[in-house]
Amino acid sequence: KEIRETLNRRYKFAIRRLAQTNSEDVFSLAMTAFAHEIDPHTNYLSPRNTEQFNTEMSLSLEGIGAVLQMDDDYTMINSMVAGGPAAKSKAISVGDRIVGVGQTGQKMVDVIGWRLDDVVALIKGPKGSKVRLEILPAGKGTKTRIVTLTRERIRLEDRAVKMSVKTVGKEKVGVLDIPGFYVGLTDDVKVQLQKLEKQNVSSVIIDLRSNGGGALTEAVSLSGLFIPSGPVVQVRDNNGKVREDADTDGVVYYKGPLVVLVDRFSASASEIFAAAMQDYGRALIVGEPTFGKGTVQQYRSLNRIYDQMLRPEWPALGSVQYTIQKFYRVNGGSTQRKGVTP
C-alpha cells in the first residue's frame, strides 16, 4: 500500500509538471535542439537560464538568501544563506513553506501548486526592494503569518572555493575544493593560499572533480599562481589564427608539492588548468580521464541588435553560447574528446 501511494504521488507530480509546461519551455527545447545540431557545445539559454548562468559566474544574486525546493504542492525552505535577509530576520526556519508572495503595494499572490522557478522569479528582485512572504510554519495545524524582507545582494559562498586542512601522519595537507571557474576565483584562491601558508601545510591538493569549467581567463590566471611565467593555453580561431594566453607576472604564489584531483566530469577550464600543471610538471594529476571539452564558447545576449546595442525595452529573449575557438595545451595537444589523462 505504501509503495502504491508513493508511486501515485510521484505520477501525479509528473503529470502536474507536464501540465505546467509553457510556451517558453517549448521554445527553449526547440532552440536547444537546433543549437546542438551546430556543435555539441553550442547552447541556447532561456531568459531564466541566462539569469542562472550570470549568477553562477558572478556568485551573487539579489534576493532573500534562501534555497527553495518543492514539497508536494508547497515551496519549502531547504536552507538559508548565512547573513542573508531570510536568516537575519529569524522569522523563517528551514522546513517552513511559502504559500504566498506579495510585492510592495500589490496583493498577495497564492503560489500553492506553482512551479518552483515561477515562485523564485516572484521572490527575487532588486536589492533594497521589499517582498512579503506568507509563511506556513513546518508541522501540522500551524497558522500562516506574513514576513516582510528587504532584498539584498547575496554572495553564494557555498559555490566559492573552499579550504580545509587534513592531517596525514605528521604532515598537514591543504585542500582547495573548486566547484567552478567563476569570475574572481583566482583572487579567492590567493587568499586561501595565504591561510594555508600560515598553517604550515606540506602540500596542497586542488580538487576539480565535477568542475564543469567557467571563465577561460580564470583558468589562465589560476595557473599563473603556480608557475613563474609562460604560456598556459593556445587558442585557435576559425581563421586559423593562434593566440597564446600566458602568465607574465613572474610571481609564484605557491611553490610546494601540488596534486590536482580530476574525474570524468572535470571539463573545459578545469582541463586547461590540469593540462598546464601536467605539461609544466608542476602537479601530479590524480583521478580519471577528464571530460574532453577543448573548445571555447562566446556568450551573447539576444537582446542586442547586431551584437552592439542592448534593447532593454524588448521582452527578455535569452542568450546563446556559441563555439568560436579551439584550445590546445602547452605541448600542442588537444583535449577535445581526449581529455586530460592522469
Where in the sequence are the language-model features?
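Extended, domain-scale alpha-helical bundle/helix-rich regions
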Residues: 1-63, 67-72
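Conserved functional hotspot residues or short segments at active or partner-binding sites
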Residues: 1-9, 328-342
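Cleft-lining beta-strand/loop regions that shape enzyme active-site pockets
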Residues: 19-22, 45-61, 70-88, 94, ...
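Short beta-strand or tight-loop elements
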Residues: 62-64, 129, 318-320
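Structural motif
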Residues: 95-97, 333
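Short, mixed charged/polar active-site loops
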Residues: 141-146, 317-319, 334
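Pro/Ser/Thr/Gly-rich intrinsically disordered low-complexity regions
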Residues: 293, 314, 321, 336-342
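Short acidic, Pro/Gly- and aromatic-enriched capping/linker segments at domain boundaries
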Residues: 310, 314-327
